[in-house]
């Protein structure tokens, strides 16, 4: 059952990411900011030619290689541990979805569409795929910590 559900969830997460980016591009002009939840979240449309926090601008070949490697390793690990803990499955599904969501942008557009601006903190503008990656990495750390505390060293 997991072999069916996980790919479906992955496709749905990628679709949500891509639809959010398409909506932003259609409804908000480049570099425009629109208040969404006052003093908490604004929406904007930025083109990110780099990585997180706009580092390594215009290094698309590097991001392509890194994404192929990370997503490939995550898929292989997921297939080998399909009966693993829910923390592990959730984390890998989110990492794969986030990586592929931004990868699609880079292949299709040559940049990643970013749109979420947190008004209450000075933080980088990000997108839904970035959120998947961040939450996925946190869940992976929890999964590995739980495995370690249970004496499971796979």
Swiss-Prot record:
Q: In which pathway does it act?
A: Protein modification; lipoprotein biosynthesis (signal peptide cleavage)
Q: Which GO terms describe its molecular function?
A: aspartic-type endopeptidase activity
Q: Which GO terms describe its cellular component?
A: plasma membrane
List the Pfam families.
Peptidase_A8
Q: Which domain of life is it from?
A: Bacteria
| Keyword Membrane found | yes
Q: Which UniProt keywords apply?
A: Aspartyl protease, Cell membrane, Hydrolase, Membrane, Protease, Transmembrane, Transmembrane helix
Transmembrane segment boundaries:
4-24, 62-82, 84-104, 125-145
Catalytic center at which residues? 114, 130
- Which cysteines are disulphide-bonded? none
**Membrane-protein topology:** Multi-pass membrane protein
Question: In its UniProt record, which GO terms are filed under biological process?
Answer: proteolysis
Listed EC numbers: 3.4.23.36
Q: What is its main location?
A: membrane
Where in the cell is the protein located? Cell membrane
Broad enzyme group? hydrolase
Relate the protein's function as given in its record.
This protein specifically catalyzes the removal of signal peptides from prolipoproteins.
Q: What family is reported? A: Belongs to the peptidase A8 family.
Q: Protein name, please?
A: Lipoprotein signal peptidase
Q: What gene name is given for the protein in this entry?
A: lspA
């Amino acid at each position: 059952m997991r072999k069916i559900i996980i790919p479906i969830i992955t496709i749905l997460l990628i679709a949500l990411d891509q639809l959010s980016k398409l909506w932003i591009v259609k409804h908000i002009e480049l570099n425009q900011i629109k208040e969404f939840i006052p003093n908490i979240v604004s929406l904007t449309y930025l083109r990110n030619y780099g990585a997180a926090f706009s580092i390594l601008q215009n290094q698309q070949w590097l991001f392509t290689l890194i994404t192929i490697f990370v997503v490939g390793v995550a898929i292989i690990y997921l297939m080998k541990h399909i009966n693993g803990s829910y923390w592990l499955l959730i984390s890998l599904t989110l990492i794969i979805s986030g990586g592929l969501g931004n990868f699609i942008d880079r292949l299709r557009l040559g940049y990643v569409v970013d749109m979420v601006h947190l008004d209450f903190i000075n933080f980088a503008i990000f997108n839904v795929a970035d959120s998947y990656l961040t939450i996925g990495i946190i869940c992976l750390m929890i999964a590995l910590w739980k495995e370690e505390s249970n004496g499971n060293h796979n």
